[in-house]
Amino acid sequence: MKMQLHFSIMSLTLIGFGFLSASRIIDVKHDFVKIDNNLFTSRHEVTNAEYNEFLKSLLNEQQWDDHAICIYDSTQWLKKLSNAETKPLALSYHSNKRYDNYPIVNITADGAYGYCRWLTEKYNNNPKRKYKKVIFRLPSEQEWMKMIANDTKNSTHNNYNIKTKNQSNGIYDHVSDGGLFTTAISQYKPNNKGVFDVIGNVAEITAEGYLKGGSWDNELAECSSEKRQNYSLPDPRVGFRVFMEILEK
């Protein structure tokens, strides 16, 4: 499904740097994997902790309208699964530190774009940055595919080895990878480029609005890298990953 994207202009401020957030400057070698020339991908999907830091900065700068656009919708958990299963998640997934390293979900494409703009401004204003000018952004579908090109490990959901006998018997379901919902980032083995969760965990938003990689709720066949997922945002099965493009070294 191709989503129509709307952009909001944000006033973004420089604060310290961390994870891909505030306590340290980004370590490109540690945090990113080179995809092509001056293009790098984050090793993991954006987490609750990272996204919450972005939201906090909007509040600190009194960017009320932008915060309203970018805030997550926790009630989407209740719409996807039964109340008994999801009420704890709806109440705590985005705020409890237990889930800090879980992927952010239940946001819109505007929220993903806003986060990228914020991260770009922080980096480019940090005097300790490695590169003179970069842009953090969502990947195009083609760039996302480059992230998994020649990936021999990419046939497993969440890069987790699902027993083939279960698949051949036709009884594979979305809990066979070891997770009933989302799982913490980097929980499973990375692909052969060192990128985590390219298949499964959460489907990832691309620049064109297509969703790639499948989610915790998809069967293995639905997570094929060639396929697109068809969800309306916000959704508890959808998050995003940032790419970094070096504009000036």
Each language-model region and where it sits:
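Intrinsically disordered, low-complexity segments enriched in glycine/proline and serine/threonine
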Residues: 5-7, 207, 248
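Bacterial Sec-dependent N-terminal signal peptides
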Residues: 1-30, 147
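A short glycine-rich, aromatic-capped structural motif
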Residues: 25-91, 103-111, 200
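Functional-site microenvironments in short loops/helix caps that host divalent-cation chemistry
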Residues: 24-28, 92-236, 246
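Short beta-strand-to-coil "C-cap" segments at the C-terminal boundary of structured domains/repeats
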Residues: 242-249
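Flexible, glycine-rich phosphate/dinucleotide-binding loops
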Residues: 61, 122, 249
